[in-house]
Structure formats: structure tokens, C-alpha cells
Amino acid sequence: MASKGIDKTIYFVRHGQVSHDVDENGVHREHDPLLNDEGRKQALQLQHDLDAEKLPIELILVSPMRRALETMKIGFQHYIEDKHIPVKVIPLLQDCGDWACNVGSYTKDLEKQFPGYDYTACHEDPVFPKKEKIYKADYKTSIQRSRVLAEFFAKVPEKVFAVVTHGVDIRLFQKIQKPEDSLDAVPKEHSFSPCQHEEFRMHYEDDKNWNFEPVK
């Protein structure tokens, strides 16, 4: 259990655009896709913006989905290479749905494609990349996972850090995702656009009493 009365500054970043191979029912079939050309352009613009903003981050936490890792690698390139900001890959930050595009890759394959980051949490996770238990693709489980993540953020020693993740995950942190909303295709209303980043203040009391407030 994390201590009570904890405040953190978190910069949420949604990954860039991907090209989905969609079947006749609108289901995305491509497994764990990378960014498309437009997504890489968005990530380069993110890099430009982040370099100009000089975020005072001490740590980067990133989803193990390849589109999030690629966004992070491009967007935070100079923070990682010049400022030596550490990167931890956190399976709890994966996307919530269970379409093929939202199912992660094996850790050993991620380490080959995106080397140099801390994959300890992935190696220690007995479930990832399977969509079971805490990663089951339903609303109730996703709410539970957001609570686990809030406690995880509270326990992180760093006070200011970036989180590169997915649109639905951010909606869950904001407590605006509804039971009827899709977990696979992020609703367009009140959602982050590709590579959007925003500063939030997190206040944590316990696993049922926490909130993320945007900094305007």
C-alpha cells in the first residue's frame, strides 16, 4: 500500500497514429503494429515540442505496445540520449482491448527491437502479454487496473515523470471512460489525439481515492 497524501506531476502522452488492417467487421487484425508514416511525423513533432518545453521529468514510463515504444523513442530521444532520463517499460500501461492490435509482443522480441530500456517489470509479470486476469479486456477489469496503476504511480520515488500510453488508459485515469465505450477503439469525444501530451497533477489518498487534474 502506498503512503497517503501523495502528489505527483505526470505528463501523459498518447502514442502516434498507426495503420490498422481492418477486416469486414471493422476489427483490427494486425498484431501490435508500429507507427505509420503519419505517426512518425507526429512523433517528430512531439520531439520538437518536448525539446522546446524542457520538461523537468526524472523518469519515463512506457506501455510495452510497439506503437508506444516507438513514439517514446522518437519523442523523448534527446531526454534519453542527452539527459540520460531512465525508461521503464510497464506492462500495466498496455492498451485495454483484446483485438490483435492491442495484444502485446513477447518481451524478448521487444528487447531486440527496442534495446536499452528497463524491461524488469515485463520479465516479472506472469501474465503479459496474454489478455488474462488483470489484463482481461472488460470495463470492470480495466477500472481495477487503473487503480493498480494509480497506486504504482504513487509508489514511484520520482515526483515528476512522463507516461507514454494509450487513449483509453488516459480516459480511465481521468475517470471519463464509460462501460458502454469501446476498449479497442478510443472514443473521439474527450480523448487525446495521437501524440497529444498534457501535464496533470495526481493526488493519491488510497486505491479508491485518487484523481488526475489537468494543468491548464
UniProtKB/Swiss-Prot annotation:
Record-annotated active site: 15 (tele-phosphohistidine intermediate)
Query: InterPro entries in the record, alphabetically?
Result: His_Pase_superF_clade-1 (IPR013078), His_PPase_superfam (IPR029033), PGM_Phosphatase (IPR050275)
Q: Name one GO cellular component term.
A: nucleus
Keyword set for this entry? Answer: Cytoplasm, Hydrolase, Nucleus
Q: Which principal EC class is assigned to this enzyme? A: hydrolase
Q: What is the lineage of its organism?
A: Eukaryota, Fungi, Dikarya, Ascomycota, Taphrinomycotina
Site positions for Transition state stabilizer, renumbered to this chain?
A: 166
Q: What is this protein called?
A: Probable phosphatase SPAC513.02
Q: Give the source species.
A: Schizosaccharomyces pombe (strain 972 / ATCC 24843) (Fission yeast)
Q: Which family does it belong to?
A: Belongs to the phosphoglycerate mutase family. BPG-dependent PGAM subfamily.
* Subcellular location as annotated: Cytoplasm; Nucleus
Question: Origin, by domain of life?
Answer: Eukaryota
| Pfam families for this protein | His_Phos_1
A GO molecular-function term, please? phosphatase activity
Q: What is its EC number?
A: 3.1.3.-
